[in-house]
Every structure is written in structure tokens, then in C-alpha cells.
């Protein structure tokens, strides 16, 4: 991920539920800042609960470098019970230059740095290229638009980027599915059942 961020030339979208103040968080932030400083359009979207310290730990540095940064459903009253609090941004996505993406369960956190007595977390992500990138790219840009509007922030004007190509890369088949608790609750399950025949 870090090498691909450093190689970016036009745009980066990063979405994460957790963005920790640890070695990984600082390394990713440094790479994103370097990209923004060299003119790459950097968009970082984190969850307002899962990454609740992001705004004080990393946001000033990213903004100073020229990155666009937002939090999804920021938590102002942590101990207040409201139904909307259950709706979080659990996606872990990175799209770089409309040419590659990382999709999976890996947050921006050092998974091996577990508190005393706890096992480290093991999660996975895949690096994607090829036609499936169109869907991933559309998903991150669409979420950015929604959160920009919902936050009543000045909508960051997004430059039109060349769409991902239709040329297959490798021999694996891939699909990108979005799951949430309302409209797409069972999409992934249905895709597994369909793929299994």
C-alpha cells in the first residue's frame, strides 16, 4: 500500500473504519501527505466512531499537506443512545489513480501490536486491477459525494478522472459488492450462493 501511494500520480481515495495513532497510522499519513504535496488529489474518509481520535491525531497534518479529509457520522455525544449510531463506515477501501485498489478487512492499524494478553488481529485485503476497478472507483467517489453533502461541507470538486480500463489483468474473476444493513444486506451471500452453483 505504501509503495502504491508513493507511486500515485493523480488521485487517491482511502476509506477506513479505524485509523490508529500507531506506526502504521503515521506511515500511511506520511505517504498520503507526500502524495498531496506533489499534487495528487488525496481524499481520506474515516468513520467518526472507529477513528474517533483521527481528527486530533492526523487531520491537521493531512489538511496542511493539501489532502481532503472527512469523518463519517462524527460522534459528538458518545454515551447517547441513538439508532443512527449503528450505521457506521466499515468499508476498508483504497483506490489509486483509477488503476488499482485495495479491498478487504484491513484498517489503518498495526494488527500485530495487540494489547497485553490479546491475540493479534489477522485480516486480509486484495489488490485489484482491471475492469472490477470501475465499480470500486465509483463506490468511493459516490460515498465521498454523499458524506460531503450530508456534512454540509463545501463539496470538494472532484476532477474527472479517466475511468478504469476494461482490460483484464490476470486470470481471476472478481466482483465488487457493497453490503449495508438496508439496501444491500444479503448481496454478498447471494453472490456466494450463485458462484457456488
Where are the predicted features?
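Charged, low-complexity intrinsically disordered terminal segments
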Residues: 1-197
Amino acid at each position: 500500500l505504501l509503495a502504491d501511494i508513493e507511486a500515485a500520480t493523480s488521485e487517491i481515495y482511502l476509506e477506513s473504519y479505524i485509523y490508529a495513532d500507531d506506526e502504521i497510522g503515521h506511515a500511511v499519513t506520511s505517504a498520503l501527505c507526500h502524495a498531496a504535496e506533489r499534487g495528487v488529489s488525496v481524499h481520506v474518509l474515516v468513520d467518526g466512531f472507529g477513528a474517533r481520535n483521527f481528527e486530533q491525531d492526523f487531520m491537521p497534518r493531512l489538511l496542511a499537506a493539501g489532502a481532503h479529509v472527512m469523518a463519517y457520522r462524527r460522534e459528538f455525544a458518545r454515551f447517547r443512545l441513538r439508532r443512527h449510531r449503528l450505521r457506521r463506515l466499515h468499508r476498508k477501501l483504497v483506490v489509486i489513480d483509477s488503476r488499482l485498489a485495495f479491498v478487504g478487512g484491513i484498517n489503518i492499524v498495526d494488527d500485530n501490536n495487540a494489547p497485553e494478553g490479546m491475540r493479534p488481529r489477522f485480516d486480509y485485503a486484495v489488490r485489484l486491477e482491471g475492469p472490477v476497478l470501475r465499480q470500486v472507483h465509483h463506490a468511493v467517489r459516490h460515498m465521498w459525494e454523499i458524506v460531503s453533502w450530508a456534512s454540509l461541507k463545501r463539496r470538494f470538486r472532484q476532477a474527472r478522472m479517466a475511468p478504469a480500463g476494461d482490460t483484464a489483468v490476470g486470470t481471476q474473476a472478481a466482483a465488487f459488492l457493497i453490503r449495508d444493513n438496508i439496501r444491500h444486506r444479503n448481496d454478498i451471500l447471494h453472490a456466494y450462493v450463485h458462484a457456488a452453483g
